[in-house]
């Protein structure tokens, strides 16, 4: 594809400590603010690509732990994705690149485990709800956004709703 994925990284001082905000570590239980990314926004607006014209802000499911049942966690995640969608739109990006790969070091977003305190059926319903909230937040900021993913279809197929077949599959809750 004739495009490029751009990772946005910013940092600021909070209570005497340097805190970093990175688009590939977007699943955080903290609501990011637009002004945190002012420098990146200005830089991206200044770009005038002639050859690489389909550019995407890179995101990743890598930062855990994830909690499907925490309303505050998902409000923050949706806020952060809406913010990245807004920045993508305002800076002429085509959209967001979603890295959904199962990195073993952080706990995977779409994994099901009975340890989460819910049945597979309840967890799947909650994941669907969170998916709707997520896409609504993104769509509100950038209605005609392009979402690009490396593994979108291959993660979901083949899937089974038979809990005995799921085990610890990393994509059991993938919508």
Protein language model features and the residues they cover:
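Glycan-processing catalytic domains of CAZymes
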Residues: 1-175
